[in-house]
Amino acid sequence: MVAAARVDETGAIWATLASVPDPEIPVLSVVDLGIVRAVEPGRVLITPTYTGCPATQVIERDIRTALDAAGYRDVRVETALSPPWTTDWITPEGRAKLHAYGIAPPMAPGQRAPACPQCGSAETEEISRFGSTPCKALWRCRACAEPFDLFKCH
């Protein structure tokens, strides 16, 4: 019975965390983005998207606030930098949400250019390796002429 209660609690904590938005891309939750690495009895383990990410403290605070509001005051939020976060940890749902929001998800290995999230054209070009946040690059579609962000692979 104790094991079943822990499974239920773990699932409820995951559901709580799925409601915590990423502060830089609020259409994604911290679960969608793959920042939450583990939920164990009494502990949530997170990894920021990169060492020194300015949003890390905000994410920790928002997670803590959500856990407290859901009644999980005894759950610790811990940060691990190793292994480092990778775009491979973005969930399929997260990738779909990025695309629907107008941000091209990270490219697959060997892919040379992202499809335009506005019109779907593969005729795109990089404008700047640096986008609106350190995690994004600025691209433009040659078919519809719309600029868009690409979530960088790392």
Enumerate the language-model features and the residues they cover.
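Domain-level signature for proteins that mediate thiol-based redox and metal-cofactor handling
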Residues: 1-154
